[in-house]
């Protein structure tokens, strides 16, 4: 994808500027001038984040004198943005770049006030949290993180994003070696659907010698959380087939995926579920494309050695829908495989 190409390009630019940072002032100034020249081009109009990301890559090349050139460009871009539909977005990017520039020039201690003045900007809050953790000020890191984590609804949670506030909060507790809060946060993330934290909790509880006593109750809580995919993935990993069958019977969601884990031990129950699910799907189907999906499931039933169930099902569907020639045609194709 184009975005991947762009991101790889920016990574390469960052690597180059980090190397040029070690060279003499003349080379650093030339590289910075080139970055500024490119960032000013109209090709970046409408792509504010890419423009400012390019400028960020030039920060490491700056000394106090050359930094004035970069800030002059920032001033110009900020002035132009007043005519945009969303000038506040440019303002945010501007504040981030200026802070990173000042931090580069004067150090984190001398720019802490500027950092906290703009703490509502997520990117800067993350920096403040990392600074606090480096200083082992875990209470401050927790406070900064909780202010955001508590303000967001659980459906905002992005399990795969390491900078999601709830993920950051877990990392804080882990780094601080706060076992009690670590367990509580790991459980919260599991019940929000992050399957990874089942393994995390398993390891922590085993280290405490408390895994067996917490195992069943943790499964019950996960079931009650209604995070079906997460719950079933955990059941599969723990080989909890009886629980998995009960859950699939309560809700046959994705039956033809989960059935493969159950059909060997519970063939009759799975065949019965397949019969019912296919019958109900057929009642809703209206064209050949949907009929093909139905017959694909019948083929799967046959692969699971449910031939007798498949025969009965095909006969019933043929009798129930004699005026659906496309369906009858697809059923006949499957019937030949019996």
Question: Whereabouts are the PLM-identified features?
Answer:
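Eukaryote-biased, non-catalytic alpha-solenoid scaffold regions
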Residues: 1-338
């Amino acid at each position: 994808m184009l975005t991947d190409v762009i991101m790889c390009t920016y990574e390469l630019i960052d690597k180059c500027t980090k190397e040029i940072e070690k060279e003499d002032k003349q080379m650093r100034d030339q590289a910075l001038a080139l970055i500024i020249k490119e960032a000013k081009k109209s090709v970046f109009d409408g792509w504010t984040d890419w423009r400012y990301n390019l400028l960020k890559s030039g920060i490491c090349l700056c000394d106090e004198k050359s930094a004035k050139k970069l800030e002059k460009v920032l001033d110009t871009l900020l002035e132009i943005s007043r005519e945009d539909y969303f000038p506040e977005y440019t303002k945010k990017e501007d504040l981030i770049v200026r802070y990173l520039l000042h931090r580069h020039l004067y150090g984190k201690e001398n720019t802490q006030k500027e950092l906290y003045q703009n703490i509502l900007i997520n990117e800067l809050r993350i920096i403040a949290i990392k600074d606090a953790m480096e200083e082992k000020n875990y209470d401050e890191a927790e406070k900064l993180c909780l202010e955001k984590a508590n303000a967001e609804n659980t459906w905002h949670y992005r399990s795969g994003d390491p900078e999601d506030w709830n993920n950051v909060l877990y990392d804080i507790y882990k780094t601080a070696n706060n076992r009690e809060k670590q367990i509580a946060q790991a459980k919260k993330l599991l019940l929000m659907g992050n399957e990874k934290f089942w393994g995390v909790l398993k390891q922590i509880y085993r280290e405490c010698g408390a895994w067996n006593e917490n195992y069943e109750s943790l499964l019950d809580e996960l079931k009650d959380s209604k995070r079906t995919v997460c719950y079933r993935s955990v059941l599969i990993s723990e080989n909890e087939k009886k629980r998995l069958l009960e859950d699939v019977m309560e809700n046959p969601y994705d039956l033809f995926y989960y059935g493969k884990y159950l059909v060997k031990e519970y063939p009759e129950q799975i065949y019965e579920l397949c019969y019912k699910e296919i019958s109900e799907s057929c009642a809703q189907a209206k064209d050949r494309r949907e009929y093909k999906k139905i017959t694909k499931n019948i083929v799967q039933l046959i692969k699971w050695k449910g031939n007798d169930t498949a025969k009965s099902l095909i006969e019933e569907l043929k009798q129930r829908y004699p005026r659906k020639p496309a369906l009858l045609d697809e059923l006949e194709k499957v019937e030949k495989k019996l």
